[in-house]
């Protein structure tokens, strides 16, 4: 059975000390985002490419399985992931809450 696309809200900090998935942060209104840090600058799509590479590595999927659906020029992005919902949910639940 092929994977369905899963969406993931992320908050990206570019020009960071290292590439990492920091954890999940939730606002008072209940919206949650996965917080990411990438070393790449937000210049000519470099940070966006780093985000896709980081998420692919964290989830164990190919870089081509991660795309930016919304927010290419924003810190707040919506990613589309070609992964099963169950695998994504297990990964997400294991992330620290920050």
Locations of the language-model features?
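Contiguous, often N-terminal, cationic amphipathic patches that form binding interfaces
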Residues: 1-44, 48-52, 63, 67-73, ...
């Amino acid at each position: 059975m092929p994977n369905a696309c899963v969406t993931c809200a992320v908050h990206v900090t570019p020009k960071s000390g290292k590439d990492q998935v920091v954890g999940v942060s939730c606002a008072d209104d209940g919206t949650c985002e996965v917080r990411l840090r990438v070393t790449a600058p937000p210049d000519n799509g470099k940070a966006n490419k780093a985000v896709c590479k980081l998420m692919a590595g964290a989830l164990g999927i190919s870089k081509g399985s991660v795309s930016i659906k919304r927010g290419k020029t924003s810190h707040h992005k919506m990613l589309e992931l070609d992964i099963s919902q169950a695998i994504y949910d297990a990964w997400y639940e294991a992330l620290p809450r920050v």
